Every structure is written in C-alpha cells, then in structure tokens.
C-alpha cells in the first residue's frame, strides 16, 4: 500500500515497493500548519486525546521554552506510531572527527589572515551526509547556545537505515552540486542547488541522494532560531516573502527493520540501535517544522541613483542575539540584479567589519572578484580583517562605462556572525586552500599624487 503526496506514506512489506515520486508542501513562514496522511489521524479541538485515532501516540516537540512570548513560541504536536522514547535504546559513543563544535580554539598553527579555498574534493570512499560533514569554522559556544559553525558537506551515498538529529542547533543547508532528499519525521524535502532548507534542532531525518555526488554548505546555528528580518522602511514586500517558503506535508514510513539513530549533543556524537524506522509521524500540527526556500524568489532592492548600499539589504534569514540589531547569524545572498547607480564604484567596497564573514559561491561569478573565487569555493574574512575587490576588479569597475548592467547567472552567499569564526584544523590544512589569496590585492596602486584628479595612468 503506497500513496505519496499530501496523504503520503510508505508501508514496506512483501511485494510492496517504495514510491517517492512526488511530495507536497504547504506555503508560508512560521505558520501554524496542520497535515495528516490518513483521514482523521489528526485530532481536532484538542492536542492529546485519551485514545488517538489509529492507535497513535501524541507527542509534543518544543523548539522554545513553554513560557516564550507568543511571537517566538514554537512547538508542534506529532501523532506517531511509536513515541520517541521507543526510538532510542542504550547509547554508545560515535565518532565523526571532522565535524567540530564551538568552542574549538587553537587546534592548528596557521597564522591569522584572509583565507580562500577551491572546492572541497568529492570523497572516493562511500560517504553519507553525516560522514561527509567537514567543519571549516566554529564561533561562539554551543553550551551557551550562541554562535554557529560553518561546514561543507560531500557525499556519494544515501543514509538508508541511519537517522540523525542535532540537539546542538538547527541546520541551514545550501546545496552546490547535486540534489538531495531530506526524509524527516515531519515530511520530505526535495532540495536542489539554488534552494535552501532549514532542519530544526531535534528533528529526526535521513539524507538520500538524488544525484550520484553531492556537495554544499551548512550553517549550524547554536542560537535563536532563524527568522525573517524586519524590512523597516522597505515596507511590506520584497526580500524573502513568507509565501515562498515551503513546509512539507506529513509523510511516514512503517518499516520494521534494524535502524540506527545518531545524535549530536553538546559537540559529541552518540548512536543507538532500534528495530524500526523512527520516521513514523502520521499527522502533525504546529509551527516548529522544517522548510525549504527557492533563492530565485528573493526580490532584491538596491540603489537606484548612486552609491552601493550595505549588504544587509540582501538578508534572507537572520538569527537574532540578545543585542538588538546585532545578529547571531545573518544568511545573506548576492543574487542576479541590475546595477544602475551613477558615478559610483559598483562592486562591494573595501571594508573592515565587526562581523565575521564566511562566503560561498553556488554558481556563476561574484562581482568583487574577477578570478580565484569559483563555484564550490569558500572565503573567510574574519572580524576586523580588511577585504574587498581584487586589483583586476577594482581596475575594471573604476573605468567601466556606467550603463545599466545586469548581473546574471550568479549566486553567492554569506554566513555572517557577530563572533570571530575560528578556523578548524581541517580548514587550515585543506589542500585546496589558496596560499596566494592575499596576492589578489598586491597590484592595487597608489593613486594619490596631491592633485584632485589623482593618478589614473
């Protein structure tokens, strides 16, 4: 018996094949959703009936304290075949040595600097999504629920009977090569390059590969949950609009086979063995759930007369800190857009920043770098370390004919945080690190000669 979509489930047994052709989603950001796979499996008018329909168990998944203000109070009620206490046994230690957690300070000897990397190579050995997580930076302190970690994932096999949840934070996933399918306890998210997904803290999932090899970026958020930024004077529209976020409809599998559940908790990994799939939520309602977003639906705003505005106008999601206006994390993109400013140096300007910037490139070319920053690559410009256009980029932009120009076929992004991003040993010793990155500014000339015109020879 197989039915996928809004009423989607898979029951595995003799003569029954799995079908994962299509899955359905519900639009909106932060909505109080409700979804069921079997008619009447979602209770109405109450959360915890004495005997839920179909013999299910009622269970609450809380993403905030009970007493959090209504606007930030997040929880969902799950109606499942077995309660989650049946999805764990005795834990044993597990090892994923390349996935690091803050604080992770001083585990390498690389000197301070601006860093850039070519893409992380694809693995040669069989590697799933969790095994393929490689930490590049960590920031803050997971025990204080502040900060983040920036990772790259590479994988060439699906998680079949292995499942995972992260108690340390939510995961923002940014694919760069290859499509994946996140099969979660609350529904299925199909994800391709150009889209992002957010998997909440505590959500059980496994990652299946749609393509042979996949690579991408992950921001692990230890702090307050990612949310939409305030638009301020921009008004009620533009940037990331709530209707474009998609939360999966309920989907479950009833699978009686040996499985493993891997847990990340306070920086350590643990594994337990169970005799069935934990992805058994038949119905759910609430506002604590995974979602995805197509970056092509981001509606950018910008300067329409002169000057280059701050990159904060490109913020897709933000995780606030306790200090107003200062983010624990900002997720920022640099999408296709028109450049029309007059008498203006149009690329991003030279900068020293109190925030620390981890950048990646999904596809195309970034307008501040003429060469060296390639799709799948990484750059890291930390707290108060100077950065900006390379010498060829400066030369080109300073002499450009300032006609309207469309930046097309490009998508760069940034994980920005208020905390210093501490480089991991893996990142420091990664063979794709460009030792000569600092040289991209070597040919910037002194143009001051005491005259108002300067020396542009």
Curated annotation (Swiss-Prot):
Cofactor names: Fe cation
Gene Ontology CC: cytoplasm
Pathway the protein contributes to: Amino-acid degradation; L-phenylalanine degradation; acetoacetate and fumarate from L-phenylalanine: step 4/6
Residues that bind Fe cation: 351, 357, 387
Parts of the chain that traverse the membrane: none
GO function terms (MF aspect): homogentisate 1,2-dioxygenase activity; iron ion binding
Binding site for homogentisate: 366, 387
Reactions this protein catalyses: homogentisate + O2 = 4-maleylacetoacetate + H(+)
Catalytic site: 308
UniProt KW keywords: Dioxygenase, Iron, Metal-binding, Oxidoreductase, Phenylalanine catabolism, Tyrosine catabolism
Enzyme class: oxidoreductase
Enzyme Commission number(s) of this protein: 1.13.11.5
Any coiled-coil regions, as ranges: none
BP-aspect Gene Ontology terms: L-phenylalanine catabolic process; tyrosine catabolic process
Pfam families listed in its UniProt record: HgmA_C, HgmA_N
Quaternary organization: Hexamer; dimer of trimers.
Family note: Belongs to the homogentisate dioxygenase family.
Function: Involved in the catabolism of homogentisate (2,5-dihydroxyphenylacetate or 2,5-OH-PhAc), a central intermediate in the degradation of phenylalanine and tyrosine. Catalyzes the oxidative ring cleavage of the aromatic ring of homogentisate to yield maleylacetoacetate.
Name of the molecule in the record: Homogentisate 1,2-dioxygenase
Organism from which the protein derives: Mesorhizobium japonicum (strain LMG 29417 / CECT 9101 / MAFF 303099)
């Amino acid at each position: 018996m197989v039915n996928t979509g809004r009423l989607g489930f898979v029951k595995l047994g003799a003569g029954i094949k799995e079908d994962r052709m299509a899955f359905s989603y519900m639009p909106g950001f932060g909505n109080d959703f409700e979804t069921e796979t079997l008619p009447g499996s979602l209770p109405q008018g109450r959360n915890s009936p004495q005997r839920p329909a179909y013999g299910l168990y009622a269970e609450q998944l809380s993403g905030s304290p009970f007493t959090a203000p209504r606007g930030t109070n997040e929880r969902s009620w799950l109606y499942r075949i077995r309660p989650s206490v049946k999805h764990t046994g005795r834990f044993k230690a597990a090892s994923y040595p390349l996935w690091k957690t803050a604080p992770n300070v001083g585990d390498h000897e690389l000197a301070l600097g601006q860093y850039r990397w070519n893409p992380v190579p694809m693995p040669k050995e069989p590697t799933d999504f969790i095994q393929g997580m490689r930490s590049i930076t960590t920031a803050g302190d997971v025990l204080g629920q502040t900060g983040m970690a920036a990772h790259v994932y590479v994988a060439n096999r699906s998680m079949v009977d292995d499942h995972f949840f992260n108690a340390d934070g939510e995961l923002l996933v940014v694919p760069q090569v290859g499509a994946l399918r996140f099969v979660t306890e609350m529904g299925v998210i199909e994800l391709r390059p150009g889209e992002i997904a957010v998997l909440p803290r505590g959500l059980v999932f496994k990652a299946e590969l749609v393509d042979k090899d996949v690579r991408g970026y992950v921001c692990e958020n230890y702090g307050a949950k990612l949310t939409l930024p305030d638009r301020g004077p921009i008004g009620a529209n533009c940037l990331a609009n709530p209707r474009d976020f998609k939360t999966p409809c309920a989907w479950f599998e009833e699978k009686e086979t040996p499985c493993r559940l891997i847990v990340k908790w306070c920086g350590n990994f643990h594994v337990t063995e169970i005799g069935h799939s934990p992805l058994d939520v038949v119905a759910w309602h609430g506002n604590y759930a995974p979602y995805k977003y197509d970056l092509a639906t981001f509606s950018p705003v910008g300067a329409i007369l002169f000057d280059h505005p701050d990159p904060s106008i490109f913020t897709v999601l933000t995780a606030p800190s306790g200090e107003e206006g200062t983010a624990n994390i900002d997720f920022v993109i640099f999408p296709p857009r028109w450049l029309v400013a007059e008498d203006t140096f149009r690329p991003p300007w030279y900068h020293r920043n109190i925030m620390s910037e981890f950048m990646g490139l999904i596809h195309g070319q970034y307008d501040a770098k003429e060469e060296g920053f390639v799709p799948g690559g990484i750059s890291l410009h930390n707290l108060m370390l100077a950065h900006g256009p390379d010498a060829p980029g400066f030369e080109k932009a300073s002499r450009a004919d300032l006609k309207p120009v469309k930046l097309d076929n490009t998508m760069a992004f940034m994980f920005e945080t208020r905390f210093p991003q501490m480089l991991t040993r893996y990142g420091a010793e990664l063979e794709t690190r460009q030792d000569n990155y600092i040289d991209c500014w070597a040919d910037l000339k002194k143009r001051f000669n005491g005259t108002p015109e300067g020396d542009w020879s």
